[in-house]
Structures are given as C-alpha cells and as structure tokens.
A protein has these predicted regions:
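A generic structural motif
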Residues: 1, 46-47, 125
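Short gly/ser/thr-rich secondary-structure transition/capping motifs
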Residues: 2-7, 173-175
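Stable alpha-helical elements in mature extracytoplasmic
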Residues: 5-8, 63-67, 103-110, 145, ...
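Subtilisin-like serine protease catalytic core
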Residues: 8-104, 117-121, 131-133, 159-162, ...
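Short, well-structured alpha-helical segments in soluble
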Residues: 109-117
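Catalytic-core segments of hydrolase enzymes
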Residues: 119-205
C-alpha cells in the first residue's frame, strides 16, 4: 500500500475509467486466462515482431501480462492494479529470446500505433544497451539524446507534453552495466526502477 498509495487512490474513488493505456512489451501470454487480467478491457492489440496475430495472447512470454496485472489487475473485489477500469492497447515489439537492433525501430512503430489510438499513457518495459551483433551504446551516452529511441522520445514528448510515457529502468542494476537502459535517460520520461520491501534500489541513475 505504501508503494502504490492505493489508500489515497481509493479515497478519491478512481479506477482509471476514461483513460487509454498503451503497453509495450515482449509478450502477453495467458492474458485472457489469468485471473488478474482476463477482465480488463482490451480495445486492440498488435504484434510488430512478425508473429502470429491469432496467437497473440497465447505467447510463451507473459511479461506484458504481469505488467498489466500491476497496472489494472483485478479479481472480484481484490485489486492488484489501480487502473482496472482503463482501456488497454497492447503492442508486442520485442522477442525476449533475441536482441536485434531492429527492435528499436519496432518499438517506435509500436509507439506510433498507440498514438494513432490516442492513448493517454504509454508503459514500456523494453530498454536497450547492447545488441546481438555486438553493436550498441555505452553508459557515457546516457544523455537523453544519443540513442535512436532517446532522440525519438525527446522529440515526441517535447511536441506532446500531455502524453505520459512510463519506462522501466532496466534489469542491469546488479550487472556490469549498473545504469538505466535506453530510453530511460530521456528527461521527460517517467522512469521506474525496482526496489525491495525496504526501499533499496537495484539500478543507479
């Protein structure tokens, strides 16, 4: 409760109704059978990785489903996510088992698709540092304007100040990288990093 401020949210009688949320991830497996997400209103979904659209919610990767649980998960009167009444748009732009540089472009295509649906909030769990061909970036480039995605988002969010873009910090906090991944370095992006129950962060700014 302390980390999500759900008591304050409940006191205002909010549910996310009237809000359009776009979610960018590597898979939404089990979305329609999971107890926390099967009741969410999904207005549209799309796969930008060349996968089978008919098998979108049967994907082997369920990270996006877990994210949606945190955003709006609800089972009966038990609530896991605060925006259980929002309208959701799901975009798969990444395949978890590979890291080609093309996934940067796929993520941008996913964002453009979400914008065409006039979403209010975009949540992305996808960040990049090094690709399968050993190309990539260095921590010195974390300036909000060097990487392909950082340049794109800096321009987009400057032009659309009302759009909320939430980005995961990345999973390299306890690895050699030790910093956020791109595009979490963009100043207008709301970057979320993980912490334990004691409030200790895994990733340095």
């Amino acid at each position: 409760v302390g980390q999500t401020m759900s008591r304050a949210f409940d006191s205002l009688n909010l549910s996310g109704r009237g809000v359009r949320i776009g979610v960018l991830d590597a898979g939404f497996g089990g979305f329609r059978t999971d107890r926390w997400t099967r009741g969410l209103h999904v207005a549209a979904w799309r796969d930008f990785t060349g996968g089978d659209e008919t098998a979108f919610i049967d994907d082997a990767t369920d990270h996006g489903t877990r994210v949606c649980t945190n955003l709006g998960g609800r089972s009966g009167d038990t609530i896991r996510g605060l925006a259980w009444g929002a309208e959701y748009y799901l975009a798969k732009t990444d395949r978890a088992e590979v890291e080609p540089r093309a996934e940067e472009r796929q993520l941008i295509r996913g964002i453009e698709w979400l914008l065409a649906h006039d979403v209010d909030v975009i949540s992305s769990s996808l960040g990049y540092t090094t690709f399968d061909d050993f190309s990539g970036y260095t921590p010195a480039m974390l300036d909000g304007r060097t990487s392909t995605l950082s340049r794109y988002l800096d321009s987009l969010l400057t032009a659309r100040p009302g759009l909320v873009f939430v980005q995961s910090a990345g999973n390299a906090g306890d690895q050699a990288w030790r910093h956020v991944s791109f595009p979490a370095d963009v100043p207008q992006v709301l970057t979320v990093r993980s912490c334990d129950s004691g409030g200790h962060y895994r990733t340095r700014p």
